[in-house]
From Swiss-Prot:
Keywords: ATP-binding, Cell cycle, Cell division, Cell shape, Cell wall biogenesis/degradation, Cytoplasm, Ligase, Nucleotide-binding, Peptidoglycan synthesis. This is UDP-N-acetylmuramate--L-alanine ligase. It is found in: Cytoplasm. It comes from Lachnospira eligens (strain ATCC 27750 / DSM 3376 / VPI C15-48 / C15-B4) (Eubacterium eligens). It catalyses: UDP-N-acetyl-alpha-D-muramate + L-alanine + ATP = UDP-N-acetyl-alpha-D-muramoyl-L-alanine + ADP + phosphate + H(+). GO terms for cellular component: cytoplasm. GO terms for biological process: cell division; cell wall organization; peptidoglycan biosynthetic process; regulation of cell shape.
Length: 459
């Protein structure tokens, strides 16, 4: 693998520079004196911002963008081998790195590289850690998978002491990283188009733990089945958090909710009350996300007052139980949930939010996930009062598994719940306008483009 010398900046070209993660990495390299160019299929606010920062951005992509002065090419997993720039770079014999490989090398510049991993909660917990470090004026560099309002995007270029990064397991991306601290929030079945089964996923997270140096730190949830497995072959420091104070260094008690579902709780350290924490985001799941953030930042020597301030300041990221507005007295929430556990967590948050009936407008994400977690999806969605299903969002897949949203609709109805399947957004919007009433809570849910339904209703 090509090794970047950060003391000798070179010209790096990004294929697909308009992506939220790629654009952030480009900004970090620009701040370190590198010459950066890139291309994408279309212009966007992100590419315009990069141009303003001094980056040469070409639209559309073409072989001619691979010029003789380029020293290294970076590409994402989404780039197909027949992409004209990918082919041209290969033919020119240029060194090439994936996005994950580049991110891993960038981490080596920082004294503390904090990676937040898990099937669920990565974006939120990465944001919580970031908000705490910002509250403590520790000038972190941040790479998060959502829009964090306090930094005006998904990336913040800070000093060289702290790099906070969301670490995704898909295609084993996080195995290219170079962490000094890893947080593992949970390990569940997901991305089964890549992983064989839950054992394969667990093995990947174990390898992720083994990336830590002997003086590194693992922060892990004791609610994960056989959590000791992940660090049995490492000699790094282990700090635990979870629901059981008997086996967790960090836990919570006396959890209470305000009128918007936001939690206040007693922080327990080694079973003893240490402080009272108030969160700025709703949901029981965020209590446990915050415990991980507290464990990480206390290890980084942040005092409790700054920890409490950071957690209170954090009001959420885009598409994580995000209030969009109201129409006809109906409150519209948008959420990225696309896994049964995430759906349950979102509906748990909704239970503490003022509402008459809870509507979920769900767009399943990928055929493989829908097929493999079919019964779990039906069970999770059955906890809503009313369910509307959109077509499956294919993403990177084609329909070869014989599964549809209509099948899921029938399964939900067999559980005694009201559910309809409507195959286009326009008719979904008409149905909701006709059937939602004053005081209802409407949640658009999924990792695709279902958020457009809520936005259209609010126009």
């Amino acid at each position: 693998m090509y090794k970047i010398d950060f003391n000798n900046p070179i010209h790096i070209h990004f294929i697909g520079i308009g992506g939220i993660s790629m654009s952030g990495l480009a900004k970090i390299l620009l701040s370190k004196g590198f010459s950066v160019s890139g291309s994408d299929s279309h212009s966007s606010a992100l590419t315009d911002e990069l141009i303003g920062d001094g980056c040469l951005v070409s639209v559309p992509q073409s072989a001619g963008n691979i010029t003789n002065d380029i020293d290294l090419v970076v590409y994402t997993a989404a780039i197909h081998p027949d992409n004209p720039e990918f082919k041209a770079a290969k033919e020119a014999g240029l060194p090439m790195l994936t996005r994950a490989e580049l991110l891993g090398q960038i981490m080596t510049v920082y004294k503390n590289a904090i990676n937040i991993a898990g099937t669920h909660g990565k974006t939120t917990t990465t944001s919580m850690v970031s908000e705490i470090l910002l509250a403590a004026s520790m000038d972190p560099t941040i790479s998060v998978g959502g829009i964090l309002n306090s930094i005006g995007g998904n990336t913040r270029v800070g000093g060289d002491n702290y790099f906070v990064a969301e670490a995704c397991e898909y295609t084993n991306s996080f195995l290219s990283f170079n962490p000094t601290m890893n947080i593992i929030l949970n390990v569940k079945e997901d991305h089964l188009d890549f992983f064989k089964d839950i054992d394969d996923i667990r093995h990947s997270f174990k390898l992720f733990t083994e990336k830590l140096p002997s003086d590194g730190t693992l922060i892990i949830n004791t609610d994960i089945d056989n959590y000791e497995y992940f660090y049995q072959d490492t000699d790094c420091e282990v700090i635990t958090f979870g629901s059981d104070p008997a086996k967790s260094m960090y836990s919570a008690s006396d959890i209470a909710y305000d009128e918007l579902g936001r939690c206040t709780y007693s922080l327990l350290i080694n079973g003893e009350k240490a402080d009272t924490i108030t969160l700025g985001v709703p949901g029981l799941h965020n209590v446990y996300n915050s415990l991980a953030a507290i464990a990480a930042t206390r290890k980084l020597s942040v005092d409790m007052e700054h920890i409490k301030a950071g957690l209170s300041n954090f009001k959420g990221t885009n598409r994580r139980f995000e209030k969009k507005g109201t129409f006809n007295g109906v409150t519209v929430i948008d959420d990225y949930a696309h896994h049964p556990d995430e759906i349950r967590a979102t509906l748990s948050s909704a239970a503490h939010y003022p509402h008459n009936r809870v509507w979920v407008v769900f767009q399943p994400h990928t055929y493989s996930r829908t097929k493999l977690l079919f019964n779990e999806f039906a069970d999770a969605l059955s906890h809503a009062d009313k369910v509307v299903l959109a077509k499956i969002y294919a993403a990177r897949e084609t329909d070869t598994l014989g599964i549809s949203s209509a099948d899921l609709c029938e399964k939900i109805k067999s559980l005694g719940k009201e559910c309809v399947y409507i195959d286009n957004f326009e008719d979904i919007e008409k149905y909701l306008l006709k059937n939602c009433i004053n005081g209802d809570l409407l949640i658009t849910m999924g990792a695709g483009d279902i958020y457009k339904v809520g936005e259209d209703l609010l126009k």
